[in-house]
Every structure is written in structure tokens, then in C-alpha cells.
Amino acid sequence: MADAAVVNVVAGALFDAQGRVLIAQRPPGKTLAGRWEFPGGKLDDGEEAFAGLARELREELGVAVAAAEPLIRYSHQYGERVVWLDMWVVTEWSGEPRGLDGQAIKWVHLNRLPGEDILEADQPIIEA
């Protein structure tokens, strides 16, 4: 059996003034469509995690990340691939988040996250 493919991913937790966190729904046509996740995406080859976070949130949500703190790094096995995820808490950002990739987004209170259909790979973030 060949070694599992490794995918490096970065995601960010953005909070609004009411203390709610932003989650995004995977759009139709993507793997695990309809499930909810923290916004982010794959790192480009050689890209540093913070730079990738800023790029992904700009591309997906139209926000400019000015500062963020690392929260947790872990791996999750998806069939034949291993996803390494770097999760950040975005502490300073500007712009109004909107789903630029056709994804629905919503603000959710932290205590309501367990009731959302969050990807299994994002479960450790909820517990962090």
C-alpha cells in the first residue's frame, strides 16, 4: 500500500462583537458538500501558515487578516490522505465576511457548535 497523501490545511476562527464564531458550509460539488467547517483551505507549496490563512480568508470571505494566534495543530485521516490542520484564532481583521466561493456562512454561539453538522476533522477545534 502506498503512503497516504499529506495535505496541509489552515483555518481561522473569526468572532463577532456578540462572541459568535463564523462557520462556512461546503458548497454543492465539493467533497462533503452541505457540512459546516471553519473557513480556510489548503496551503500552497512552501507557504507559511499565517500567510496561507490570510490568503484563504481573503479569497473565501473577502476579509483582510491583520493578526492571528495559533490555537491547535493536529492531523485527521480521510481515507487515503492525511490532513494536517493549523487552526488559528483571528484577533484582528477588517471587511465584512461574505461567501465568495458560493458557500453559505453564518455566525454561531460557541455553545451551539455541537448542534451544527461540523466536519469530523474540525471536532478537535470545538474541544480546544
PLM regions with names:
Residues R20-E60:
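Conserved Nudix-box catalytic region and its N-terminal flanking loop in Nudix hydrolases
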Residues D16, A64-V65, Y74-R98, K106, ...:
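Active-site-adjacent beta-strand/loop module that shapes the phosphate/pyrophosphate-binding cleft
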Residues E37, W107, E120:
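Short aromatic/basic micro-patch
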Residues P97-G102, E116-E120:
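Short, charged, solvent-exposed linker or helix-capping segments at domain edges/interfaces
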